[in-house]
Amino acid sequence: HMVWGLHPTLPVKKLWFFPGFTDRTGGLLIEDGLDEARRAFDAAAWRRAHGARDGLRTLFFFAYPVNAIDRLAAGLRAAGEPLNLMLAPGEASDMLERALKGDARFNVVRLPFVPQEEFDDILRAVDGAVIRGEDSFVRAQLAGTPLLWATYPTEDKAHEIKLDAWLARFRDCLLYTSPS
């Protein structure tokens, strides 16, 4: 973070800026009024307006096609719980929908791509989310939504480094906030 480097193809310098959770990063950009917006949001009304069935838990799914989608589908089936599945556009959602096809316990709702403000509404409306990417990862936490972070595997294992760093930070937070 805050390191100057050369652009790979142009004769210009770049300043690397990385968001994050420590003093060695650029921190997180959190807009004013976020807590008030979260408290004022009517999640049940949003779910009804977007095709969710009342009385079911709702999971938002936004992953990469390289993630373990068949294993997720098998786990959802094995859990035996009826569920609203709000699927973001993309191949990964197509794969999950095919894997769960014919199982009436799952109310599958296909959502369109939306602007950031509406994406935050999705995250506020659901009981949990499978999300991809660093931005979605942060926005889900800011929405207070339990999440499974579906990282994109890279050859240099950067995804594992990011995940391990977050898990270490999360464990520290749990220890700090633990009632015991």
Report each predicted region and the residues it spans.
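Catalytic donor nucleotide-activated moiety binding site of glycosyltransferases and closely related
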Residues: 80-112
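A nucleotide-sugar donor-handling region in carbohydrate enzymes
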Residues: 1-69
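Conserved small/polar residues in nucleotide/adenosyl-binding loops
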Residues: 176-180
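A donor-sugar binding/catalytic signature common to diverse glycosyltransferases
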Residues: 113-162
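Short, hydrophobic beta-strand segments that form beta-sheet elements in well-ordered domains
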Residues: 1, 84-89, 129-131
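Short, aromatic/basic amphipathic alpha-helical patches
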Residues: 2-8, 76, 96-102, 162
